[in-house]
């Protein structure tokens, strides 16, 4: 039935009213998903056919001919059809339809571009699609994945205009929210925009990318235009209210997928410093981006090391993200130009925290301190000083790492760890009592240790001697006549 209605349209313009019949099929309340999909696909093919025949171009306003009336009728119904297409992205439990309708949407965008004299990408329908996509609370993960992998990554013009459109959509919705418009759900827009932006590896064209339209748009291939659109899109997204999870998602990619492609990376300074001063887990993730701005883009942030020092608390050594933190901390303290008093405070605080840390965390702290002492020999005096000489001058509660008095204190904590209940930790800590001739530890070898890996290592360890047992083993062959049981 649907196929017959479609074929009749190709045969004669007299059958254009079949468009209305097909349109009625796109109704999930009265038809099955398969019928809705088939009817929508048929109309997509019909409108692509009509665009090639010039029926999707509006006639001049003063043209009242029969042909002009047909064109206006076709264009009006085309708008209704595209609205029906985009509505599906706001419906629940229709993941398969969302992917299918995405394909139809992009085909129509291509057909519209072919109507243009230059053959470049036309944005009229695409921007309405972007508005619906970013505003949807029912957008499926599989639809986003298909949009990113099938269109945004391989096609420069689709990606470029998405950057432009997302900025326009966000600006429009922010203005709407000022008038208490209930439709302007900024949380949803932030969630969808960042999900999509974070999934794009690079905004710049590569040898494997091309244009979705027949001819590439000049602006979509110019590096300066791309970076400007990319920057405006990201800054608009970051101006929206972000949940802790969204903060984490952004901060996980910002140093690799955002900062290198911005025209003015310093514009992220406020965002990163706010993140660094916020929730503990967010602060840890903000380290990399903030440090990148400091090293590569001359950001002046004098409170970086005091704030970094404040992150060293008892909770840190129990977090899942401690491995990432120690990778970054090793990078931040690697410069030999840092003051010895600063390095000494970090060493001493970590040593103190190790006293109450789990074995997996201690296995990171000891090699980390060893490497720091080798890199900063001035701090070796802490290792050789006896705590009985003048007591421990270290002020654990002092927030400024330059004023803790750690450089005048003793690392008695490392001596204590040499008597740890877990023999492997005690053996590892004993390296501090030996000459510092051993090369620096590869920190990566210690970052993933935990109770599970330690138990597994113990269970796999071969026994040198059979352990003695209290009771004599008995077998059925030994008989029961002498048994006391």
Curated annotation (Swiss-Prot):
InterPro entries: CCAAT-binding_factor (IPR005612), Noc4 (IPR027193). This is Uncharacterized protein C1604.06c. One of its GO terms (biological process) is rRNA processing. The chain crosses the membrane at residues 284-304, 328-348, 353-373. It is a multi-pass membrane protein. The lineage of its organism: Eukaryota, Fungi, Dikarya, Ascomycota, Taphrinomycotina. It comes from the Eukaryota. The keyword Transport does not apply. Keywords: Membrane, Transmembrane, Transmembrane helix. Belongs to the CBF/MAK21 family. GO terms for cellular component: membrane; Noc4p-Nop14p complex; nucleolus; small-subunit processome. Its main location: membrane. It is found in: Membrane.
